[in-house]
Design a protein with these regions (language model features):
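Conserved, mostly hydrophobic/aromatic
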Residues: 45, 107, 180-183
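Alpha-helix-loop-beta-strand connector modules within alpha/beta enzyme cores
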Residues: 41, 96-103, 143-176
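Catalytic cores of alpha/beta
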Residues: 58, 113-124, 166, 171-187
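Histidine/lysine/aspartate-rich catalytic loop segments that bind and position anionic ligands
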Residues: 107-141
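Glycine-rich phosphate-binding active-site loops on the catalytic face of alpha/beta enzymes
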Residues: 133-135, 172-214
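Active-site-adjacent beta->alpha loops and helix N-cap segments on the catalytic face
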Residues: 27-37, 85-98, 113-117, 136-155, ...
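Glycine-enriched alpha-helix->loop->beta-strand junction motifs that scaffold or abut catalytic
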Residues: 18-21, 38-39, 75-76, 100-104, ...
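Non-catalytic, usually N-terminal nucleic-acid engagement modules in DNA/RNA processing proteins
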Residues: 1-96, 216-236
Length: 236
């Protein structure tokens, strides 16, 4: 599993990220050129989560223009196709249909959307599909979130027989077994290093190395699922 680390770090400490897999968000784009100079591979994020947290709309045409030179020059750079957190299926499908850069992007499936939509995206020829937390599953690692993720991976495993490349947006900690999660993503991302490297006990090199060593258990083994409340009410 690849760990993408947010590259929004100031000063010379940024260079300690050299040789690792890095992420630059459209919401914080200042390091995009520098990161391409030192990264093993690059992920360009659309900034949808940041926009959602502050109630801001994103100019997607600006995003298309921003990613174009990087995915054009660097074969190891990919990006997240625009999405709107809590936007609903119709809006998400429209944004995917408007994407101008073919399979250099990956679509987002939100946990509050129907699982068949995820299966359709996986089967649609995209190199990977991103999973994002939203709606009643907005809080990563909550009990409801964990139950939903177990259902998702159970269904994906049963449907395809082998695990496709799924990318966990903001799911690095839960994917690696620091809790009861341990989900076999192809890749995950996190801003942990960018946010917490200034703590006394931390260095960038130490943090990145520790994260990159953590890998989920494979293969996926079917897990017990919690029945939804609606399932009980329909049987009464």
């Amino acid at each position: 599993m690849i760990h993408y680390h947010c590259a929004d770090i100031s000063g010379d400490k940024f260079l300690e990220l050299a040789g690792h897999h890095l992420l630059v968000s459209h919401a914080y784009p200042r390091r995009v050129s520098d990161a391409h100079d030192i990264a093993a591979t690059m992920l360009l994020d659309n900034g949808a989560y940041t926009a959602w947290t502050v109630g801001k709309e994103v100019d997607w045409n600006d995003y298309y223009t921003w990613v174009e030179p990087w995915i054009g020059k660097y074969p190891t750079t990919w990006c997240v196709i625009p999405d709107i957190v809590d936007g609903g299926e119709e809006i998400q499908d429209k944004l995917i249909s408007q994407w101008p850069h073919n399979n250099r992007g990956s679509p987002v499936w939100h946990l509050d959307e129907p699982i068949p939509r995820l299966l359709s995206l996986i089967d649609g020829g995209w190199p990977r599909v991103c999973l994002g937390s939203a709606g009643e599953y907005a809080e990563v690692a909550s009990n409801g979130w964990m139950a939903r993720m177990n259902s998702v991976f159970n269904k994906v495993d049963k449907t395809f027989g082998q695990m496709p490349w799924l990318h966990g947006l903001r799911m690095q900690g839960i994917a690696c077994g620091r809790s009861s999660g341990n989900f076999p993503f192809g890749s995950v991302d996190s801003a942990d290093v960018a946010r917490n490297n200034n703590r006394k006990q931390n260095t960038i090199t130490k943090m990145v190395t520790a994260w990159d060593k953590q890998q989920p258990r494979v293969p996926w083994r079917q897990r017990p699922e919690q029945r939804e409340l609606a399932d009980f009410t329909t049987t009464l």
